[in-house]
């Protein structure tokens, strides 16, 4: 028999916000666009309430973007685009059982896009059916306020704006509170919640570990490609006086309250006009959460909170991240050893041979020219953060997704290319169609996620033993055609590269093909 659909037979659920009705398809109960909170612009969210039965068969609005959606790179990272509105606080749930006693592991997904873009349904691979059906878990994905709606500091202009710079994060905490209060209705265990996210979503996972009001709302965290040192997104340490004053001047306003009601496109246009000059002069332009009473700050600067060390963490990167979006300038499979060395000398000069030797020691199966695509954005900071976490007593499990794809003469893994495997959705992404590789790799990665969500450790029968990171020592599970644990394996590569190249800059690797 084919896939079964049911709507009329699906019971109405009585949540803390109101009555809710979803639908059933192919073994999974699906609820879309559940309003978990409401907020006026720049204000803290309040719990949602509605009368009657809320139809949960349509995704909710996604947060407005500052720039127009531009389809590109769809083969590498297939996207979905959706109507936008700033009242975007909604979540989606996939589960295979509506039994309050089922106590299934709960996974809550925070999307990528930095703090400025993205949505809970942005990527095709975000679909939650596999986690619910094959993974026997409940999957929740969350929309929240972004960019200037979620992260613009107006606190110098009045007490009512006290936490406007963290409004987007406050939305996420409100979503977690809604999940805690209601997920048992969907078969989930409110005391076994794993939050996970990629890119900006990974950053959000770390941030939530640094927010006291989120304590107790999740028990584990998975950080995917979400660690960078410094201030790459421009949050800054100063307050919003300069940027907000400049926006008001651009709009011809004399009262900050006018920013609360001006149409979003005009607000975004004013920000886009005045922010570059302020950023160039080192001023605050928003862009991320702001350290203070609500958010305790980046752990590189502020250290991890004591409570954070109680939360086991999976944390990792992909081989190339941003460096591999643009096509290579050559067919590496046709290069001789001499040609490879000459190419590397153009980048690493007299240190090229040492770089190549260290790289071949770390990745003996890869083409030597692939060292040019190695991730210098996130891998080193990720290892550093995992060690910092371990030093404080936390349990961290490092990974690196190093698969080469059959595209453009063998493209190393790029930012987002691991997502289909974590969601058990490699069959939804065409470029993952790699015979004898993708099924095995998905089993390894998907199995690690599910084991971590259930037990707090990613170990499972399909993998070699996965050791915890230590304060001065790092074992990494390298997911590839042959998955294996490697010990401090790429330290020498980066040491040799860093003798020649300046520290990585976020803007150095930005291309028109970057996805999130």
Where in this protein do the model-derived segments appear?
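Non-catalytic accessory segments of hydrolases
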Residues: 1-166, 190, 432-445, 455-463, ...
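Mobile gating loops/cap/lid regions near enzyme active sites that modulate substrate access
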Residues: 34, 379-516
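Active-site loop->helix "elbow" adjoining a glycine-rich segment at hydrolase catalytic centers
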Residues: 112-113, 167-171, 199-202
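Alpha/beta-hydrolase active-site loop
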Residues: 162-184, 239-242
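Substrate-access "cap/lid" subdomains that shape
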Residues: 181, 215, 224-339, 368-391
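Alpha/beta-hydrolase fold nucleophile elbow
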Residues: 186-198
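Catalytic nucleophile serine of serine hydrolases
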Residues: 197-200, 212, 225
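Short glycine-enriched nucleophile-adjacent loop
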Residues: 202-214
């Amino acid at each position: 028999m084919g896939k079964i659909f049911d709507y009329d037979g699906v019971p109405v659920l009585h949540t803390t916000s109101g009555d809710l009705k979803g639908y059933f398809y192919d073994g999974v109960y699906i609820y879309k666009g559940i309003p978990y909170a409401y907020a006026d612009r720049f204000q803290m969210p309040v719990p949602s309430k509605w009368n009657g039965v809320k139809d949960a068969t349509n995704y909710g609005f996604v947060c407005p973007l500052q720039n127009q959606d531009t389809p590109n790179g769809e083969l590498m990272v297939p996207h979905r685009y959706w109507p936008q509105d700033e009242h975007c606080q909604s979540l989606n749930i996939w589960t295979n059982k509506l039994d309050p006693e089922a106590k299934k592991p709960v996974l809550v997904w925070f999307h990528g896009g930095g703090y400025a873009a993205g949505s809970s349904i942005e990527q095709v691979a975000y679909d939650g059916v596999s986690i619910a059906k094959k993974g026997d878990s409940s999957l929740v994905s969350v929309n929240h306020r972004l960019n200037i709606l979620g992260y613009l500091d107006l606190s110098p202009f009045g007490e009512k704006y006290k936490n406007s710079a963290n409004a987007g994060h406050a939305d996420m905490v409100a979503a977690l509170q809604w999940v805690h209060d209601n997920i048992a209705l969907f078969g989930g265990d409110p005391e076994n919640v794993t939050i996970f996210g990629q890119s900006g979503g990974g950053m959000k996972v770390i941030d939530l570990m640094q927010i006291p009001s989120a304590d107790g709302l999740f028990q584990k965290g998975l950080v995917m490609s979400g660690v960078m040192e410094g201030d790459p997104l421009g949050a800054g340490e100063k307050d919003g006086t300069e940027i907000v004053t400049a926006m008001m001047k651009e709009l011809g306003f004399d009262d900050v309250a006018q920013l609360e009601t001006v149409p979003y496109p005009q607000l975004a246009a004013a920000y886009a006009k005045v922010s570059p000059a302020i950023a160039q002069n080192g001023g605050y332009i928003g862009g991320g959460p702001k350290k203070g009473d609500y958010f305790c700050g980046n752990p590189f600067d502020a250290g991890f909170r004591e409570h954070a060390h109680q939360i086991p963490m999976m944390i990792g990167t992909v081989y190339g991240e941003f460096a591999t979006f643009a096509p290579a300038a050559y067919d590496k499979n046709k290069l001789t050893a001499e040609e490879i060395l000459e190419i590397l000398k153009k980048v690493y000069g007299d240190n090229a041979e040492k770089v190549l030797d260290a790289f071949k020691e770390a990745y003996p199966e890869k083409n030597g020219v692939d060292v040019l695509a190695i991730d210098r954005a996130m891998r080193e900071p990720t290892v550093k953060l995992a060690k910092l976490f371990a030093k404080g007593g936390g349990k961290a499990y490092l990974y690196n997704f190093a698969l080469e794809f059959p595209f453009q003469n063998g493209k190393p893994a790029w930012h987002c290319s691991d997502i289909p495997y974590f969601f058990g959705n490699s069959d939804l992404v065409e470029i993952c169609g790699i015979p004898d590789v993708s099924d095995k790799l998905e089993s390894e990665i998907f199995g690690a996620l599910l084991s971590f969500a259930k037990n707090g450790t990613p170990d499972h029968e399909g993998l070699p033993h996965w050791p915890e990171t230590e304060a001065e020592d790092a074992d990494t599970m390298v997911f590839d055609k042959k998955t294996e644990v490697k010990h401090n394996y790429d330290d020498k590569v980066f040491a040799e590269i860093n003798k020649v190249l300046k520290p990585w800059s976020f803007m150095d690797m930005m291309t028109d093909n970057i996805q999130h």
